[in-house]
Amino acid sequence: MANSASSRKRARQAVKRNKHNSQIRAKVRTFIKKVTYALEAGNKEQAQNCFTIMQKMLDQAVNKGLIHKNQAARKKSRLNSQIKAL
């Protein structure tokens, strides 16, 4: 348990940031799933639309330090190659 006022404030801020960051990560995962489901259904247009949104969200997550830049690049590259293969 936090004792000083500053440590209590830090604990509150950590909870708030954790909630916000987990929401952003969940949105990114949701759009990755949307692209994957569109690929499985063979719907190239929907996959392409979701992919552009997903790219933007991944880049924002990288800039905020939630996802490593190499991980984001890997996800974008693999999904883009699957879209091109359709």
Swiss-Prot record:
Residues 7-25 have a biased composition (Basic residues). One of its GO terms (molecular function) is structural constituent of ribosome. Keywords: Ribonucleoprotein, Ribosomal protein, RNA-binding, rRNA-binding. One of its GO terms (cellular component) is small ribosomal subunit. InterPro entries: Ribosomal_bS20 (IPR002583), Ribosomal_bS20_sf (IPR036510). GO terms for biological process: translation. It comes from the Bacteria. SUPFAM superfamilies: Ribosomal protein S20. Residues 1-25 are annotated as: Disordered. Binds directly to 16S ribosomal RNA. Belongs to the bacterial ribosomal protein bS20 family. This is Small ribosomal subunit protein bS20.
